[in-house]
């Protein structure tokens, strides 16, 4: 007996690496999976640095709008404004596409409003 049968709920926080989720899902199929806020935020900040390398005001505004959207449960709406085609600069467009892919592939793990409402650490 390892004590897991007494646990009401298992919550796993990870960085978004597919191998982490694969192992976690295999071992704990009924767990709640959360993309940790640090890595979520890090990806958003890195993307904003490429979009607005010289414009701190718009960079901060963009970061805040993306993070606020996810934190307030507006996941689909926020994902829709992360649009690679909105950027003429190839490097910016590529970075936005990478961010969108990262967030879409972890969409079921970024329900931060729900997690905070349930008292989970993110």
Predicted regions and their residues:
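Catalytic center-proximal scaffold of phosphoryl-transfer enzymes
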Residues: 1-122
């Amino acid at each position: 007996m390892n004590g897991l049968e007494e646990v009401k709920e298992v919550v796993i926080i990870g960085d978004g690496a597919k191998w982490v989720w694969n192992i976690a899902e295999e071992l704990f199929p009924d767990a709640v999976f959360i993309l940790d806020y640090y890595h979520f935020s890090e990806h958003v900040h890195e993307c904003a640095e490429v979009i607005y390398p010289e414009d701190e005001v718009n960079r901060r505004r963009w970061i805040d709008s993306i993070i606020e959207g996810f934190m307030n449960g507006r996941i689909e709406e926020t994902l829709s404004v992360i649009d690679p085609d909105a950027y003429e600069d190839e490097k910016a467009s590529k970075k936005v596409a990478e961010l969108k892919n990262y967030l879409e592939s972890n969409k079921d793990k970024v329900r931060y409003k729900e997690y905070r409402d349930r008292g989970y650490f993110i």
